[in-house]
Amino acid sequence: MSRPLAQAIGEIEKRLRSAGRLSLFLDFDGTLVPLGPDPSAIRLDPATRETLKRISRKGSIATTVISGRAIDDLYMRVGHVEGIVYAGNHGLQIFGRGMYFVEPTAAARSSELCRMSSALVEKLKPFMGAFVEFKGLTTAIHFRITPEENVQQIGTVVRDTIATNPECFQLKSGSKVLEIVPRTNWNKGAAVRWINRRLGDGEILSIYIGDDNTDEDAFRELPDSITVKVGDPAGTLARYQAPDPDAVHDFLLRLTDCELSRSAGH
């Protein structure tokens, strides 16, 4: 059972001060920024961006922003922060700090996914508020502002569409969104492992903060690390729980202060 982050901050700071290097992973929507009815309207607020810049200037902290958004979209909303790694499409795309990766199975199936997404655009036109977002390697079907009585029908339409190619694609559910993703062993946990291996030799303490079902793969990958579920902690593998993005920002400020005192002590 996860513990409230605010109650555990003392023990967390003790671990941070004794760690050699830190690898910080942050989900975007619902973690760094609040969820909203229109994903295209969401931006990282200046205060949080400035905090990320302060953290990224610390040579002993490697920061990754990881999201289900397409990597270009993620980069545009976070903005350029020197030293940050950007991981889009749930880690299927990665770049930053000299790293570059595109998951090959997802890349090979992009054209077929594009055709499937175009078909869904037509099929979902009757449902008010539902829209399809093709993200290159994955596709999201958003229904945050769709009347509740239509949600089940939307799910049926999407599942029937995927059923035409079940060996290549699978469906994942999030907060008021369904995602069509390629069948591959790659997920956010695999992305975390890939990034950490490229940060060099030596012991690394990972911190992962996320709010989505897809973040559970990362929590599973990091059983001995500092893992934080944002929002409802029911069923999570994370050690700690934070109520909202404001609490995440407060934690990041504490992390910055902790790193400053740690650096002063070395």
Where are these regions (language model features)?
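Asp-based phosphoryl-transfer active-site loop
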Residues: 17-37, 65, 192
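Conserved acidic, metal-coordinating active-site core of Asp-based
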Residues: 119, 127, 133-207, 213-221, ...
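Hydrophobic "anchor" residues on beta-strands that sit immediately upstream
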Residues: 23-25, 85, 207
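Mg2+-dependent phosphoryl-transfer enzymes with acidic/Ser/Thr/Gly-rich catalytic loops
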Residues: 2-6, 19, 45, 189-266
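Short amphipathic alpha-helices and their capping/turn segments at secondary-structure boundaries
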Residues: 4-20, 73-80
